[in-house]
Amino acid sequence: MSLEQVIKEIEQSQEIKKKEILENTKNILDKMEAEKKAKIDEIRALYQEKMRAESSRITASIIDKANIEARSILRNKIEEILEGYVSAAQEILRNIRNMPEYPALLNKMIEVAKKYLGQDCIIKVDSKDKAVAPSSGITYSNIDPYGGILASSRDGKVELDLRVSSIMEEVLEKIKVKIYTRLEE
């Protein structure tokens, strides 16, 4: 074998090795590029999911705050309306004694007290109602600015509060409870 052939074989061998090295390098770079792309896609998907979850959480928080604020506005408006009705009802109560139905109402309250507490029960009527209440078995005192009666059994164990202001407070409280219960549904 001549020197030229040996040199040519060496050059061919080097050329083959260069091609192998280039091919291996290209394969390694392609593999690294594919791994890089896969990692980027994985990170992107992870952050997109985190952003979706955070967006959902923020949206839910905004909706909750809006609902709370809307309910607060509604409660305030209802309270305002109720106050208007309470004022109107109190105005009517202030003048209930002047109504033609009041003597019959007062006598009905006395009948109810005697029916449930006994004929010998103690009945207190406001002094201002002396003219419209029957006089037998009735005690007169300042029990309520609007009228009504306070009654108790003879032994004092059972009391019946039929004062107009007490009844009105009770009714208003029940109305408020019903309204707020419906709001919470």
Curated annotation (Swiss-Prot):
Subunit description: Has multiple subunits with at least A(3), B(3), C, D, E, F, H, I and proteolipid K(x).
Membrane topology value: Peripheral membrane protein
Cellular component terms (Gene Ontology): plasma membrane; proton-transporting two-sector ATPase complex, catalytic domain
NCBIfam families recorded: PRK01194.1
Function according to Swiss-Prot or TrEMBL: Component of the A-type ATP synthase that produces ATP from ADP in the presence of a proton gradient across the membrane.
Localization, UniProt: Cell membrane
Entries under SUPFAM superfamilies matching the protein: V-type ATPase subunit E-like
Record-given protein name: A-type ATP synthase subunit E
GO MF terms held by the record: ATP binding; proton-transporting ATP synthase activity, rotational mechanism; proton-transporting ATPase activity, rotational mechanism
Keywords attached to this entry: ATP synthesis, Cell membrane, Hydrogen ion transport, Ion transport, Membrane, Transport
UniProt similarity note: Belongs to the V-ATPase E subunit family.
GO biological process, any: proton motive force-driven plasma membrane ATP synthesis
